[in-house]
Amino acid sequence: MAYTTLLRCTLVAAALSAGKAFASPTTAAPQAKTTTSVDQAYRESLTYFFDRPATSMMEALPLGNGRLGMLSDGGVQHQRITLNESSMWSGSVDSTAWNAEAYKQLPAIRKLLLAGRAKEAEDLIYRTFVCGGVGSGRGQGANTPYGSYQVGGFLHLNWDKAPELSGYYRGLSLSEGVSKESLVVDGQAYRTKRLYSVLGREVQVVHLTNHSEEARRDTLRLSLSRPENGHPAAEAGFLTLSGQLPEGKGGRGMSYAIVVRPVLPQGGTLITRGDELLVVNAPTVELYIAHNTNYYDKRLPVMARSIEQTLQAKAVGEANLFAEHVQRFTAQMDRVQARFLGSDPARSSLPIQRRLIAYYEHPERDPALAALYMQLGRYLLLSSTRPGALPPNLQGIWTETIQAPWNGDYHLNINLQMNYWPAEKGALPETVGALTDWVESIVPSGERTARTFYRAKGWVTHVLGNVWQFTAPGEHPSWGATNTSAAWLCEHLYNHYRYSQDRAYLQRIYPVMQGAARFFLTTLVKDPKSGYLVNVPTTSPENSYYTPQGKAVAVAAGSTMDNQILRELFSTTREAAMALGRDRTFVDSLSTALRQLKPTTLGPDGRIMEWMEDYKEVEPHHRHVSHLYGLFPGSEITPHGTPELAEGAKKTLIARGSSSTSWSMGWKVNFHARLGDAEGAYEVLNMLLRPVDAIDPKTNKPYGSGTEPNLFSSHPPFQIDGNFGGSSGIMEMLLSSETGCIIPLPALPKAWKAGSIQGLRVIGNATCSLSWSAGELDRLVLEAHHAYRHTLLLPGEGRGYVLRLNGRPLDTKTLLHQGRLHLPQMQAGDRLEVVKKA
């Protein structure tokens, strides 16, 4: 970029900024009113650290503000900071994905499957009923229309000298969303940094202090780089990196620009040399980093906007930005506080890589690490999405590659949904805004897919999702034929309503739910053998079975997961319509279809059947346990309501095995928690927290799956869904409400002998706090934020507890029905207190 071009962008940015404060965007998450004081010692307990620089991304510490992300390796002489932005995607809308001839083969496919000729049907699907074009490129789609999430670029901080250190620290505060780095020479501070992605703003910040004369004299060289499609420059006191990503059809697609504005508030010299900026003799250096794409607005002048944002940040000042960021971040993280007592005090002083190893050897000595891991899930969600941005992808917002694993996309047969499991109960409901926006954005494409492939009404999507509204089947039926993803996504939207009781939101999402339900009302077919309505073709995600002829196939006429999801979709859509007083005829159609779906069924061995018939699975220990959707995240299987199915679910989990990919283990923690199996949940959680390089005694090789040194979950490779699944599982072990009843401590393991958790949300728009000791509930407080009648399940039917509503005692005998306490209607502001009798 020529100097005059950058100067012109600077002038444009200055004009844009003239007379305008650096206001938070309208899409920033609303701030919570924190009613519970939080001591600094607790916030410090939500910190983990390394005692050395990172040797890979899996040792870097993640920062984010919901759109912008940052990973620093904390290098001593050579430091690399990875920069990410959630819309940084190659690719473009792919009109070839809609296979115009596919619908012609659908009758033949259905006929073959219903006749038991599954192998022939699968072959026919592969030839005729997959997406047009190359689809996702089998997970290597960076240069295809499907595209890939990509790294933005790298900010390099290079010094001339490598000091001889006597101390090193690199830590992350989950409470504040701040990473701090410290170099010590001869026992004295040499250089410190703090890094953060400003919540509610559009910049990231690196604040560097040189504490000694030697550190100040050491020249700092700043530069930006990118493996491809990036043009670095250093002009007029700015570092810039700009370019266009491939759109997958031979042309150039999305434009982006990264701008770094160094500021030397205490003096020093800034020198331009080639595409570097040199900082000489500066006590303090402030780096303001902005990163924009034209994904949301093709006309956006991305360079001018990025320059504008750095100028505005400079005008506000780093100290003010830092204070504002910490206030906003802690306000949201403080909503939920978890204290698991009984840890060895020495554990928290260990560098995280050593603490993980110590936990693997003796987890009972560090319950606090489980509490930290639960909060990490909330932290990663808050950092990787926000209203007005995009949902977290398979890697959240953090990647260092051009070709992200599996394109860093939105896998819709569990992975994107799992990302949101901690959102509602973890008191971060604002994060669901991005999911709602994204789901609404793919509905028109899903309607076209419904028409093109199925000649059906409504809308549908399959396994693959990206930022370009891809909704067609995947390129292979063994995994790409699953078509209940839209229905599953709708359940997340409806769950937001269940938690918030926001009628305006329900009115907004009802057409989305209705469209998803309408698709299946027009595509389900009657199975001539059983008489039930079945979804044909489908799969049980990514798993295969043996036909009676001994052939291994994936596609089927109906699956248990489909039936469970559709039963939930039809039920909740009916509830929504009735709550809104809408579509009586449509409601009747849903009721009729519900009666014709096959119930969840036990096989001869007592396990939950995965398909309509009792087939033998090809992989008995498969990572997906899709036929237990009705246990979690669904709620049709419960120990109290369906004890036989709950027992069948236990047998299914035993047969499937515990050790697996990280996200699968995260899912299984939730399964065991829903079953009330405390020790089972704890065992799988500890497997999830297993260091990835721990040796598997069966193979004498590293497990690979588990937890990376920086606490990212590993499939392998890194997939963020395991973090979110594990976080949700810990919450489910302590409190459950999604089955229609508030259950405190449903799966409390013996190792968590005493502790407390405050601020978890429950269905009906209320928050719940509780404490326990000796493995028993001591106290529970339920605070209502909306009119709702709650049901409570207490040990011994509540006989050992005193209940007070707004200070007035309640008679548990009059509230008890079928083992549960049906509480009086609570209004916003009401407070229920449950205290164990002395």
Language-model features and meaning:
Residues G515, F519-A576:
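Acidic/histidine-rich catalytic neighborhood
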Residues M1-A32:
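Bacterial Sec-dependent N-terminal signal peptides
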Residues G396, E400, L533-N535, N543, ...:
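C-terminal catalytic domain of Rieske-type non-heme iron oxygenases
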Residues P30-P477, T484, L493-Y497, P528, ...:
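Aromatic-residue-lined binding/catalytic grooves and analogous aromatic/hydrophobic interfacial grooves
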Residues S485-H496, Y505-T522, S664, A681, ...:
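Extended, hydrophobic alpha-helical segments in both membrane/secreted and soluble proteins
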Residues G377, M513, L566, P633, ...:
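Hydrophobic, well-ordered secondary-structure elements that form the walls
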Residues G141-D160, I720-I763, T767-C768, S773:
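Catalytic cores of secreted or luminal carbohydrate-active enzymes
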